[in-house]
A protein has these predicted regions:
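A conserved acidic beta->alpha catalytic loop
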Residues: 34-47, 60
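Catalytic-site signature of metal-activated, phosphate-bearing donor transferases
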Residues: 64-72, 96-263
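Active-site beta-to-alpha loop of glycosyltransferases that engages the nucleotide-sugar donor
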Residues: 3, 7-21, 36
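Short, acidic, metal-binding catalytic loop of nucleotide-sugar glycosyltransferases
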Residues: 21-29
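Short beta-strand/loop segment that forms part of the nucleotide-sugar
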Residues: 28-36, 56-57
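Active-site-proximal specificity loops/subdomain of glycosyltransferases
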Residues: 46-87
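Short acidic donor-binding/metal-coordinating loop in glycosyltransferase active sites
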Residues: 89-93
């Protein structure tokens, strides 16, 4: 079951090790569009043999407009090459404990697009190096605003037609959504207050006048006091998020002959 992942980044050196630890074992190819990172982002990505890094060309264009345009077309090169494509931001960990078997079962059922169930994850401090976030940092809250059509069959979908933020879409082609949603999208943005504040400040500095005028990503402009209050509230309300149900194991074939076949 071949899976190609497409993402974008800017100065993500802190989250990249966790991102690669999650996705490298479960996807076959990772294409990262870099928006002129100046930290160790490119160095860390280059160390992974599955990663191909490309420049994100956007000039003065709105950050969100550029990303919307990118993710409408970048995945099309995987037609005829991959069974599934996954579109995810660096802090979005699409998760199922039986990943390959789950995707194979979905494809056998004729499903061509999978909408992941969104969870806003939170931790009191930044996780230690080597942590497997999806299975060790498991406290958060259900957030339907984070639901996302993260996985689809490239040969079946003509256009995804995302809305801004890519949490909703109006796909065209052979569109068959899964009847039940088992894949999770665990959003690891709130990894300690210090990390959250620093990331908010950095991303706020990247918003263009067009972004601000449209009210896009306005949450990056919140003052530190309100961000701190929201973070404390998230910690207090967080609960352990259970893993999606595992797939039932296929029954073992009995070696014992039935009575009507015995001789």
């Amino acid at each position: 079951m071949s899976v190609h992942l497409y993402t974008s980044c800017w100065n993500e050196e802190l989250i990249i090790p966790f991102f690669l630890r999650h996705y490298e074992p479960i996807v076959d190819r990772i294409v990262v569009y870099d928006d002129n990172s100046t930290d160790r982002t490119l160095e860390l990505l280059a160390a992974c043999p599955k990663v191909e890094t490309r420049p994100l060309q956007r000039g003065a264009q709105s950050f969100l407009d550029a990303h919307l345009a990118l993710f409408e077309t970048c995945w099309q090169e995987s037609r005829g090459e991959a069974d599934w494509v996954c579109l995810a931001d660096l802090d979005e960990f699409v998760f199922h404990p039986d990943w390959h078997a789950f995707l194979a079962a979905q494809k056998d059922d004729g499903v061509t697009i999978i909408a992941s169930v969104g969870y806003d994850m939170v931790s009191e401090s930044f996780p230690p190096a080597g942590a497997q976030l999806a299975t060790t940092l498991t406290r958060g809250q259900r957030d339907f605003h984070l639901d996302k059509p993260s996985l689809f069959v490239p040969d079946a979908i003509d256009r995804v037609n995302h809305t801004v933020g890519r949490h909703c879409c109006s796909p065209t082609g052979q569109v068959v959504f899964a009847q039940k949603r088992y894949a999770q999208l665990r959003h690891y943005k709130s990894l300690g207050l210090e990390y959250l504040l620093a990331r908010n400040h950095a991303l706020a500095s990247r918003l263009t006048e067009e972004d601000r005028a449209r009210g896009w990503s306005g949450h990056y402009l919140n003052d530190d006091a309100s961000i701190r209050a929201q973070f404390i509230k998230k910690l207090a309300q967080a609960e352990t998020i259970p893993s999606p149900p595992r797939l039932p194991k296929a029954p073992k074939r009995s070696e014992k002959k039935h009575w009507w076949r015995r001789r």
